[in-house]
Amino acid sequence: MAETPADHDHFAPLRGAEFLVLTTYRRTGEAVPTTLWFAEDGGVLYLTTAAQAGKVKRLRATPAVQVAPSDRVGNLQGHSLPAQARVLEPHEFALAIAALQQKYGEQFTTLTTQMDAARPAGSRIYVVVTP
């Protein structure tokens, strides 16, 4: 399907937000919100998390998600937007890393270095969220 200008505007309500709430769904349909850093690039969002995080299992089972701008502790700062999420393949990680590094700079480097030191190699994954 061809991209339209509306696709690039889908996530406009998130612009300027430092955090978002990603809502994934259990197989029962129960919503599970999680606050995360994110970066937008080319009309898509990039996120990072631990490979073993519950949200990864949930989005693999049910790729339909909701995203909403939030503060650091998950208080919503706007309306939720429907979206689709998928775990990126390792060869796609560079796009996500570059977008997150561009947005968060040294904070991103410091945080991921500290978190990765406490986990085995390959335990960090990246997720792309599309309209």
Residue ranges and their predicted role:
Residues 8, 14-15, 45, 82-86:
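Residues at structural and domain junctions
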Residues 52-126:
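Short, structured beta-strand-loop surface elements
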